[in-house]
Every structure is written in C-alpha cells, then in structure tokens.
C-alpha cells in the first residue's frame, strides 16, 4: 500500500461524520484511489454501518466500484440495510451476492440476511437461506443456528425453530433465550417454562433476558409459585434492580393476583420509567381498583413522568370495572385536552363499556358514533354485551344489525343475541337465531382454565376428560357442588345468564365448566387454607361466579380468578367485584 493510501485509511479510521467523509472522498478521487480495495472497504464500512453514515451514499460507492467486491464489502451493505427501515434491500443485495462469481457468503452474511428475513416476515426466503447454510457447512455454528431459530420464531414457525434448536450441537445462553422467547411470544407458555427447566438440567444459567421472558409466561398462566422462584433468582444474580426486570416482576405479580407483591417491587425501585407506572396502573385497573389507579396516575404525573396511551387504558379499565363513570369521562377528556394523546379503538371501547356497565346504553351508542372508529366491530360487540346485561332488546338489535353489516361474523355475537331474545321471551326470534348459528356452522371459542399446583400448571377445558385424574376430579366436583349448594349456591339458567363467549352452559348443578374443574382439582391437591389462583380465557359466567362465591364460603378458601375481563377475589362468599362485572 502506497503512503497516500495509508494516510487516507488512517483518516477514514478517525472519521465521525458524513461531512468529513465527503472531504476525504474528494481527496481519494483527486488522487485516483477510488478503486483501491482497502480505501473502498473503509469508505463503504463507514457509510453502511456507522450511526452517522448514509446507506444511499454506500450504495452509490458500491455501484461505481470497478473491481469485484469482497465478501466483507457485501456484508457491510447487507448488514447496513438489515438494520435500516428498508430490510428488503438487504435481501436484494444478498441475492446479488449469490450471483457474484467471486464472493461467497460467510457466517456473517447469513446472520445479517436472516435478520432481514426476520423483519420482512418471509418464510420462503428463510427456508432458502437455511438450505444455503446447510450447503455451506455453517449449520453447526451456534450464532448462525441461533439466527435461524430467531428467524423461524419471528415468522411463527415454532416447530421448525424448535427442530433447529434441538439439532444444535452446542447451545449457548442466547440460543436458550431465543427459544424461550419464541414459546412465550406465540402463547406456548407452558413450553417456555418447561424449556427453562431443561436449560437448568443442561447446566446453563439464565440471565436478566431469560427471566423477563419467563416472567411474561408466568403472568399469562398465573404461575405465581414459579414467578416467586424467578424473583429469588433475580435477587441471587443481582439483576432485580434492572428497570426492565422490575417491570416484568410488577407485571407478573399484578397478573397473578398479588398486588401486594407488585407494590413491594415498585416501592423498592430506585429508578422508574413509564412502563413501571403503567404496570401498576393497569394492575389496579384489572383488579377493579379504579380509585387506586387514579391515585397512582396523579403520583405519576407529579413525579414528572409523562403518561402515554397505555396509561389511560389502565385508568379507563379501572374506572369501568368500579363503575366510576364521572371519573372515567374526566380522564378520557384530559387524555387529549391536557396530554395531547389521540384515543384509539381500545380507549373508545373502554368508554362504551364504562357507560354500558352503568346502564347508560344511550351514552354508549353516542360514544360509538362520536368516535373516529365507529366502523370497528369491537365497539358494537361491547355495546351488544351491555345490552345483554341490561336486557335492552331494542339497542341489542341495533348493535347486532351493525355487526352483520360489517360482516364481523363471530359466534359469540349470535350467542349474545340469542340470550337477549331468550330474556325477552321472544321465542320466534330465539329460534331464528339458533337456526342461523347452525346454518353458518358458527363455533364458539372453547373455555379453558389454568391452575398452578406446586411448580406445575394444569389446563382444563369445558367438559374436559383428557386429564389423567379425570375420574377423580369429576367425583370431587360432585362433592364440591353439593357442599356449595348446602352453603346457599343455586345453579342458574345458562340461557338467561350466559355472558359474552362464555363456556357452553348446561344449566344444571353438575355443569363441567373449565373453572369448576380447576377449582375441584385445586381443592383436591392443596392443603386447607391454600389460596387457589385460576386463569380463564373467557369472561366467567354468572353461574360459575355464584358457584365460586359459595365454594369460598363452604371450604373457607380464598379463590382468585382472572378472566378475560378482570380479576375476581372470592373470600367468605363475597367477590371483590361486588357482582359488578
């Protein structure tokens, strides 16, 4: 390398802006060194990879280079575009590289290309690159294999991701974290928790990222025991003070029904961000503690943290679940007037629900028409649910008609309307709606419930016969129902009381709804006085709500149920929702 070239390379190594680079580039051209491989490589590297670089300038440099680019030259552009707002360009340069007669992809090329595939959500391209990785002999490389797992995971191909992971000869911590995150992200929370146990059996210790992914899964299935164990591990590896770990702990405790522990974590934090405050406000909201949510909101604003759209979602949830109509309206208004945030369909849905629960159905209808998303089926479905609660046939038909116009075919809507007709004793309309359900072959979402016993999470579905202890569970359930009846439980007519997308109700004392099976199993497998914590994917029906109240009284147990709508804390025959849900 000549002296001029060495001087220019040193200048490029110290370059920190495009303004300086352009000056250096002009010297390169004046001295006729624009095609010098080392100088070109340094120019390209800064433009493509540096934070202050320019991908458009990098592309111009690349396209005007007379010689054959090296593998590292291709990698700079593929890498640069993989991190940009145009990841598709990264794939286009990867394709061009494959057509090159000189340069071949290396493990860095595959990593950058797979990252782009992950971002553009292209399974065919991922499969194609996977084949190239195998042919190139890089599949045994932990970094490349992990990139494949991450790419398949991002595209929803969990089975392929799991297969690639299982076939890896060497798995590092990053590989385990990616696989755990994959299971957690797609809702396979039991698999995520099982993966952690497998990880421990292979002698791999987790880090803060492992814990955050696992805490998310614990939150979804209400695995409090597992969550508490992970909290201890966070303390042992001294990462509990990390804001994102503390936020995950607050979220987990709140969603597992342990607000006291969530508050404990919050109070112990030295630093808090908007997610910290949001986790607490939403936690109070879903537990029906609207007053406390508002109090936390005021503390948040006073501490100088600016609320965002999620903050107000938690506030409105709390107001809706506690019947705080006036307060809900006030905070909905200041969302835009004081904090300049634009409400979205979720905020409007909360307002429709707020008015609807309070019986102000006309206000619900006005809110829908006044919103910018009045064509969204969610709002009309929410109104329909309120019409069912308050037996308002007229507005129920308005909401149902609109849902049909929007072609928002949902079995739950028809079930709701059927219940409304049944409550109004309109036999003809009831029969017509049932006929529509059968003719369209509409299937309702099956109800399922989770309960954690020890470190194991058990899942039950309505009329479940798949559990290995099924016979014993049904026998226990019969005894539990009898004791609940002695305590005052009266099974309700499901046609009159079934809520939105509830389990299929049979209207008899031995109805085998998923939460009833979970409660029976919990009573079987825990000692007297142990709190039962159950998570349900649908809104709990009135019959099961009544059943759980009397079970808590008959067995002197606290039972915490998290359904699709909110938390219910049952104790001594009383629910924390005060039958307002």
Swiss-Prot record:
Pfam family for this entry, one: PPR_2
Keywords: Repeat
Gene3D superfamilies: Tetratricopeptide repeat domain
Region of interest: Type E(+) motif: 455-485
Start and stop residues of the PPR repeats: 70-104, 106-140, 141-171, 172-206, 207-241, 242-272, 273-307, 308-338, 344-378
Transmembrane segments annotated in the record for this chain: none
Region (Type E motif): 379-454
Protein name: Pentatricopeptide repeat-containing protein At3g56550
